[in-house]
Amino acid sequence: MKTQRDSPSLGRWSLVLLLLGLVMPLAIVAQVLSYQEAVLRAIDGINQRSSDANLYRLLDLDPRPTMDGDPDTPKPVSFTVKETVCPRTTQQSPEDCDFKKDGLVKRCVGTVILNQARDSFDISCDKDNRRFALPGNFFRKAREKIGKEFKRIVQRIKDFLQHLVPRTEA
């Protein structure tokens, strides 16, 4: 008489259940996005909703705030995006696009959820009014200031020397 223990199908089912038990936790872990991945997904959403002609790409991501471990809790985010040369209608990833020279820069704040299954974000972006100092402008302004200061010093030396020259009375 054959017992269930001798059945080859029971061994296979046991193996399948064991493998499923090992794979399921990996699938759950894979559904949690990193902070940066969640922000990049939010930028994809911003690009889809945008009425602007070109795509935006992440320019600067503020440091990740300390957060709890629950991926379903909204996490605060703040970052800056800049306009790229790629049209919004392209199928290209924004990360593959170059920034547009003098492209529009936007400051974005809001919340994201790290649970990939929920894929939720609430972000608002406004034109960034902060001035980004370009190296060329910095050096030009520094050169102008040094030039003005140099002229002022030369004039003071000339004035000093003129006062040293003995005056002759006519």
Swiss-Prot record:
Q: Which cysteines are joined by disulfide bonds?
A: C86-C97, C108-C125
| UniProt GO cellular component terms | extracellular space; vesicle
Subcellular compartments: Secreted; Vesicle
Q: Where is this region: Active core?
A: 150-162
Instruction: Answer whether the UniProt record assigns the keyword Signal to this protein.
Output: yes
Which InterPro entries does this chain map to?
Cathelicidin-like, Cathelicidin_CS, Cathlecidin_C, Cystatin_sf
Where does it primarily localize?
A: secreted
Q: Which residues form the signal peptide?
A: 1-30
Q: Tell me how the protein is altered or processed after translation.
A: Proteolytically cleaved by proteinase PRTN3 into antibacterial peptide LL-37. Proteolytically cleaved by cathepsin CTSG and neutrophil elastase ELANE.
Choose any GO biological process term that the UniProt entry carries and state it. neutrophil activation
**Keywords attached to this entry:** Antibiotic, Antimicrobial, Cleavage on pair of basic residues, Disulfide bond, Immunity, Innate immunity, Secreted, Signal
One GO term in the molecular function aspect is: lipopolysaccharide binding
Q: Which residues form the propeptide?
A: 31-131
| Source organism, top-level taxon | Eukaryota
* Record remark: domains: The cathelin-like domain (CLD), which is the propeptide part, does not seem to exhibit auto-inhibitory function, as it does not inhibit the antibacterial activity of antibacterial peptide LL-37.
Q: Which family does it belong to?
A: Belongs to the cathelicidin family.
Instruction: Say what the protein does.
Output: Antimicrobial protein that is an integral component of the innate immune system. Binds to bacterial lipopolysaccharides (LPS). Acts via neutrophil N-formyl peptide receptors to enhance the release of CXCL2. Postsecretory processing generates multiple cathelicidin antimicrobial peptides with various lengths which act as a topical antimicrobial defense in sweat on skin. The unprocessed precursor form, cathelicidin antimicrobial peptide, inhibits the growth of Gram-negative E.coli and E.aerogenes with efficiencies comparable to that of the mature peptide LL-37 (in vitro).
- The protein depicted here goes by the name Cathelicidin antimicrobial peptide
Gene source species: Nomascus gabriellae (Red-cheeked gibbon)
